[in-house]
């Protein structure tokens, strides 16, 4: 679980220090910065995918300038610190990305450590063999770092000036602490099922072998469902039964591979016709993806599940079901979501709500406190307090 996060200089987030709980629901006006917070986890995901992917993602997203608070003229770097707690221990990972030539980023600092152990590791380059090559290395506690694999004793400063995270290499060849942190960093899953256009991957055929995890845009939903049906029939049936609550005419999925590919199809009650994604409403497709995501077998769940406006296109009753599923899945994985739905907000406790507001161009994040609202909650729901601007989060 991600226990704490600090961010500086990322989009509208000039400076943020935030403790996180099993459920974290961001509410606020349009443009307040909710989606910027959510997009930070997508940024981290690309940063940890494989060498070259961070710069590819930055380039596709408009360049490094577009990620910096008020642009590179005002902000020169992005800084972040993440603190994790898991069954393997408590860990810390931090990095600093500096604006560089050609509208790109370079790492000016990157470090990690075990919070329960006084000795700390530091990210170092793969295949480094000379202190002259990498003159800036130190531990979190500023003590000398003994690089046993390199047989070097270094007392210099931090390593800097590289374009991709060194944690990618150390996640497979470094210390156990490095491996654990890399796995935690890789296990953020950000999902947004907004694209239901004619060219959306959700509506196309996909490989039957692309079934390990549900894709960010549910582009492999059919293959993922087929894998659950074959290996986890009990969970598959729960998915089908829940979709029937949202779409009463839904009977079952028709998951028939053809040439090692598969298309999302289903039948309805009272007919033998087979329906395809192009015949369904946007809300129905999103409901299928959300229910599958939230009811998948626990072993395939990510450590941190991130959702951006999951209520989009859903009937009010469907929103309440999704809220219940989020509460249930939070017992097995951490959930971070942004929403504009009063109905969804009412599915959660006050301490799970984070109000996001924009003041002087920067986003602020404030978690609600139950004790401060006890008198109000005797007469009003959370959504009513939101609409009345008692808790903030309105334009």
Stretches with model-predicted labels:
Residues 1-14:
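N-terminal pre-Walker A segment at the start of P-loop NTPase domains
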Residues 21-61, 110, 217, 287-293, ...:
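Phosphate-binding glycine-rich loops of NTP-binding sites
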Residues 261-263, 268-271, 277-307, 317-320, ...:
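GG-anchored amphipathic helix commonly corresponding to the ABC/SMC/Rad50 NBD signature/C-loop
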């Amino acid at each position: 679980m991600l226990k704490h996060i600090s961010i500086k200089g990322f989009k509208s987030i000039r400076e943020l220090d935030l403790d996180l709980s099993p459920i974290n629901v961001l509410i606020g006006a349009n443009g307040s910065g909710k989606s910027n917070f959510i997009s930070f986890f997508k940024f981290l995901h690309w940063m940890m995918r494989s060498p070259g992917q961070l710069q590819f993602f930055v380039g596709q997203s408009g360049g490094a300038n577009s990620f910096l608070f008020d642009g590179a003229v005002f902000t020169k770097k992005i800084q972040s610190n993440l603190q994790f707690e898991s069954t393997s221990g408590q860990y810390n990972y931090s990095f600093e990305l500096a604006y560089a030539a050609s509208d790109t980023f370079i790492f000016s600092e990157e470090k990690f450590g075990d919070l329960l152990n006084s000795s700390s590791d530091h990210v170092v380059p793969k295949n480094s063999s000379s202190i002259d090559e990498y003159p800036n290395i130190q531990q979190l506690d500023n003590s000398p770092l003994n690089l046993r694999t390199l047989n070097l004793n270094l007392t210099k400063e931090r390593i800097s000036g590289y374009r991709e995270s060194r944690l990618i290499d150390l996640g497979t060849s470094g210390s156990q602490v490095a491996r654990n942190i890399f796995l935690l960093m890789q296990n953020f899953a950000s999902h947004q099922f907004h694209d239901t256009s004619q060219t959306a991957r959700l509506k196309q055929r996909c490989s039957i072998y692309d079934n390990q995890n549900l894709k960010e845009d549910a582009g492999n939903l059919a293959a993922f469902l087929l894998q659950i049906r074959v290996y986890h029939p009990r969970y598959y049936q729960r998915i089908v039964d829940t979709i029937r609550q949202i779409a009463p005419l839904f009977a079952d999925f028709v998951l028939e591979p053809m040439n090692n590919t598969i298309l999302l199809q289903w039948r309805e009650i009272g007919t033998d016709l087979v329906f395809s994604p192009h015949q369904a409403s946007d809300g129905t497709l999103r409901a299928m993806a959300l229910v599958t995501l939230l009811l998948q077998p626990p072993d395939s769940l990510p450590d941190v599940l991130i959702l951006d406006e999951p209520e989009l296109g859903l009937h009010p009753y469907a929103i309440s079901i999704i809220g219940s599923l989020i509460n249930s899945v939070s017992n097995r994985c951490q959930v971070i979501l942004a929403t504009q739905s009063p109905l969804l907000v009412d599915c959660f406790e006050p301490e799970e709500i984070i109000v996001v507001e924009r003041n002087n161009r920067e986003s602020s994040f404030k978690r609600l406190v139950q004790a401060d609202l006890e008198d109000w909650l005797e007469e009003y729901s959370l959504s009513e307090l939101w609409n009345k601007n008692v808790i903030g989060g309105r334009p």
